């Protein structure tokens, strides 16, 4: 999206002066190729990079293409593909959190749906901001380039803050989910022990009241019951450890993806800044040359008129 804005800025500024050289095509190299393989969401990100690269290869038609609805339509398709991959990942996450209690699982599913809705709203906001920013650029043709650069830098800072805030919020939610899963599993084990405890005591009472053969049977039955109880406790503990490991794996994946998003945002900010600053400096130099030419032309005009009168 930032590259799309940069291409739009280059095109509009180039249209202000006829003798300005065209911006050379930005070569992304192998940076996009690494997203073609891997998880589905990585492939969707690769298609997004491919679209940005295509925008950069436009020359004479770039202004007409960007000012039309084509860019918005292409962005809509990318949003739909990304949301589809998000839904798939959400279903996979819910499957990994399946052993939780139904009440907790329903709450987790509801919160994940809310997070998904916020993500869709953010992407729609990006698309709407593109349309709004495109209109603002058309109205800023006569204003200072410093103001334009300041607006771009401000938007990039806000985008990075939003990514960091969303990543931290997701980490906190995962910590809450892990604590809820552990508490629910421990509560289930305690409930099971409370239900089986009276049965063990009842077996001991029967054993003391009956004769020796019956007492031996009751003792054997009590031993089997205790063995089953211990087995159930061990299984419940193993299940709790398994659930805890699954939650830790999910949390590690999310933290890794959040770190990748942060690094990509920082690299994107530095790359856009390195592209835009040379353009602004070149425009300032050309503007100074144009002002100097106009001043020279104004200074020589009275001299020419005096020569013609003589």
UniProtKB/Swiss-Prot annotation:
Residues 155-165 are annotated as: LDL and other lipoprotein receptors binding. APOE exists as multiple glycosylated and sialylated glycoforms within cells and in plasma. The extent of glycosylation and sialylation are tissue and context specific. Glycated in plasma VLDL. Disulfide bonds: none annotated. Residues 259-310 are annotated as: Homooligomerization. Sequence repeats lie at residues 77-98, 99-120, 121-142, 143-164, 165-186, 187-204, 205-226, 227-248. Its main location: secreted. Residues 77-248 are annotated as: 8 X 22 AA approximate tandem repeats. The keyword ATP-binding does not apply. Homotetramer. May interact with ABCA1; functionally associated with ABCA1 in the biogenesis of HDLs. May interact with APP/A4 amyloid-beta peptide; the interaction is extremely stable in vitro but its physiological significance is unclear. May interact with MAPT. May interact with MAP2. In the cerebrospinal fluid, interacts with secreted SORL1. Interacts with PMEL; this allows the loading of PMEL luminal fragment on ILVs to induce fibril nucleation. This is Apolipoprotein E. The gene is APOE.
């Amino acid at each position: 999206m930032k590259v799309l804005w940069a291409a739009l800025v280059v095109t509009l500024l180039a249209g202000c002066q006829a003798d300005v050289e065209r911006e050379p095509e930005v070569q992304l190299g192998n940076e996009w190729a690494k997203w073609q393989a891997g998880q589905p969401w990585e492939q969707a990100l690769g298609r997004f990079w491919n679209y940005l690269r295509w925008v950069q290869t436009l020359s004479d038609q770039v202004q007409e293409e960007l000012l039309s609805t084509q860019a918005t339509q292409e962005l809509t398709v990318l949003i739909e593909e990304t949301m589809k991959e998000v839904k798939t990942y959400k279903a996979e996450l819910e499957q990994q959190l399946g052993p939780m209690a139904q009440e907790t699982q329903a709450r987790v599913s509801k919160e994940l749906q809310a997070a998904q809705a916020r993500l869709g709203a953010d992407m729609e906001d990006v698309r709407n901001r593109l349309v709004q920013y495109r209109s603002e650029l058309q109205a800023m043709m006569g204003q200072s380039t410093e103001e334009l650069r300041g607006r771009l830098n401000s938007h990039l800072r806000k985008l990075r803050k939003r990514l960091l805030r969303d990543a931290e919020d997701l980490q906190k939610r995962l910590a809450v989910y892990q604590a809820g899963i552990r508490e629910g599993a421990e509560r289930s084990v305690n409930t099971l022990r409370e239900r089986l405890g009276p049965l063990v005591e009842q077996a001991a009472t029967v054993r003391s009241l009956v004769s020796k053969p019956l007492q031996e049977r009751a003792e054997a039955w009590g031993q089997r019951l205790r063995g089953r109880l211990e087995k159930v406790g061990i299984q419940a503990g193993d299940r709790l450890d398994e659930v805890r490991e699954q939650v830790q794996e999910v949390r590690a994946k999310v933290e890794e993806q959040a770190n990748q998003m942060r690094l990509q945002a920082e690299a994107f900010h530095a790359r856009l800044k390195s592209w835009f600053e040379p353009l602004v400096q070149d425009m300032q130099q050309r503007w100074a040359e144009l002002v100097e030419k106009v001043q020279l032309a104004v200074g020589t005009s009275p001299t020419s008129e005096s020569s013609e009168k003589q």
